[in-house]
Regions:
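PRPP-associated nucleotide enzymes
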Residues: 1-342
Length: 342
């Protein structure tokens, strides 16, 4: 009887394991904040699901009001919100959305933040400077985020500001694809880093394309103001492709483009993951001699493209959608570091 009981227990536990194994993973729900609804819609279209119902509004005193319009109990929730536009309002909205889902018993809440806010404030560059990127990381965790998906962090060490998993996706595979398909003379190209901080990213792209790379070294005096620039590398009669993770007022890349043409480059392109384009950026690009300024849609670009015909956009919704699908199914995301999903 004793052996029989053991045998029954063994069989019974394997039956239970079998049942647990067959039981479906919790369903996925994707919600969009108000910063970039267009990108969120593209992501869910690729996943073949609907956007979750949510009402986002402001009270008359300008406090953010969030109403999640459907049950998220036991669900795997993804909230898409980029750090652009009204950055502080959008960040607050994201924190409240995360918290609303968390206290409504979502099994896991992932913040999908294509362009991470405050990413440039990642170190003390002068006395008494705040490290705001770390503060944002703390706020996301306290709000209840279990996981972060972002793209081309300004400094990849920001991943270490979190105690939760962070997937820092790369636009690089999509950028390589764009270069090969849209710059006929790319084999005669040279990939240029507009500053030393970007050199690692740029050498990786140059290696993948099997072309040379150049570097522009700049000395800054004040924030958002560029001073002297020194070009290291031979660009004469070559197609120069400037690559950077973000451009804000575009002083650096426009200055760099002039420097490259002075040095004899035949054409100049700029490829940027996050096109913030604030202040005088658009007029600077219009006046600079770029063949094209190529950005991804981690930030809404429709208005910028209307104002500036040189701006072109690479859609990265398929990368974010595939990252969500793989995360939901418990698959590895590292495939996306070197491939563009179809």
């Amino acid at each position: 009887g004793w052996e029989g009981a053991l045998c029954y227990a063994a069989n019974h536990s394997s039956d239970e394991q079998e049942l647990a194994f067959r039981r479906k993973m919790p369903n996925v729900k994707v919600f969009s904040g108000s910063s970039h609804c267009d990108l969120a819609q593209k992501v869910v279209d690729r996943l073949g699901i609907e956007l979750g119902k949510v009402v986002l509004k402001k009270f008359s005193n300008q406090e953010t009001c969030v109403e999640i319009g459907e049950s998220v109990r036991g669900e795997d929730v993804y909230i898409i919100q980029s750090g652009c536009g009204e950055v502080n309002d959008n960040l607050m909205e994201l924190l409240i959305m995360i918290n609303a889902c968390k206290i409504a018993s979502a099994s896991r809440v992932t913040a999908v933040i294509p362009c991470f806010p405050y990413a440039r404030q990642d170190k003390k560059d002068k006395s008494r400077a705040p490290i705001s990127a770390k503060l944002v990381a703390n706020m996301l965790s306290v709000a209840g985020a279990d996981h972060i998906i972002t793209m081309d962090l300004h400094a990849s060490q920001i991943q270490g500001f979190f105690d939760i998993p962070v997937d820092n996706l790369y636009a690089e595979p999509a950028v390589l694809k764009w270069i090969r398909e849209n710059i006929p003379e790319w084999r005669n190209g040279i990939i240029v880093s507009p500053d030393a901080g970007c050199a690692k990213r740029v050498t990786a792209i140059a290696d993948r394309l099997n072309v040379e790379f150049a570097l522009i070294h700049k000395e800054r005096k004040k924030a958002n103001e560029v001073d002297s620039m020194v070009l290291v590398g031979e660009v004469k009669d070559r197609v120069a492709i400037l690559v950077d993770d973000m451009a804000d007022t575009c002083g650096t890349i426009c200055h760099a483009a002039g420097k490259l043409l002075e040095a004899g480059a035949s054409k100049v392109y700029a490829i940027l993951t996050h096109g913030i384009f604030s202040g005088p950026a658009i007029s600077r690009i219009n006046n600079a001699c770029f063949e094209a300024v190529v950005v991804t849609n981690t930030i809404p670009q429709d208005q910028h493209m209307k104002e500036c015909p040189k701006i072109q956009c690479i859609d990265v919704s398929m990368i974010l959608a595939e990252a969500i699908r793989r995360t939901h199914n418990g698959e590895s995301v590292s495939y996306l570091f070197s491939h563009v999903p179809m």
